[in-house]
């Protein structure tokens, strides 16, 4: 199984980036690879319409370490852990997302990587404009 670390540097304070990325209601604004619509809360779980169908998302508890890991339970019942970190960077914050190939073909892995790159670019765009607080 291969892993890839996809990252983007965002010209914003790490705490601001973390707060935005860790807020589930913001997922549809930046994570099109995961959320195509509003997030529905069911206890600690979140239901999201994704390109794969309805998925359940569970985030780690908010923390001061910049960890925004989340599990995604796919429609078939498989659970995928998505490690996501917000790190301090000389130019603001660096967001690092780890993608694991698991049972994906090489082409699927490449497509998944491209989706994550687009999502992180959207996150950067949102946070480097005057939009979100």
Task: Show where each model-derived region lies.
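Hydrophobic ligand-binding cavity/cleft-lining segments
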Residues: 1-40
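Short, surface-exposed coil-to-beta transition loops
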Residues: 3-5, 53-56, 78-83
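Structural motif
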Residues: 11, 42, 62-64, 89-91
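Hydrophobic pocket/interface hotspot
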Residues: 17-21, 27, 46, 59, ...
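A structural signal for short hydrophobic beta-strand segments in well-ordered beta-sheet cores
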Residues: 37-39, 59, 84-86
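Short, hydrophobic/aromatic-rich segments at coil-to-beta transitions
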Residues: 40-47, 63-71
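Short, charged/polar surface micro-motifs in flexible loops or helix N-caps
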Residues: 51-55, 61-68, 75-77
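Beta-strand/loop substructures that line and gate deep hydrophobic ligand-binding cavities in soluble
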Residues: 71-129, 133
């Amino acid at each position: 199984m291969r892993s890839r670390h996809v990252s983007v540097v965002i010209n914003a304070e790490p705490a601001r980036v973390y707060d935005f990325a860790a807020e589930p209601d913001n997922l549809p604004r930046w994570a099109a690879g995961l959320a195509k619509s509003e997030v529905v809360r069911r206890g600690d779980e979140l239901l999201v319409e994704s390109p794969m169908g309805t998925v359940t998302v569970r985030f780690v508890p908010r923390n001061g370490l910049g960890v925004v890991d989340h599990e995604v339970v796919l429609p078939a019942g498989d659970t995928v852990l998505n490690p996501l970190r917000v790190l301090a960077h000389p130019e603001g914050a660096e967001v690092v997302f780890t993608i694991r190939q698991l049972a994906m073909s090489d082409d699927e892995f490449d497509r998944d990587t491209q989706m994550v790159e687009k999502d992180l670019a959207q996150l950067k765009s949102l946070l480097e404009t005057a939009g979100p607080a």
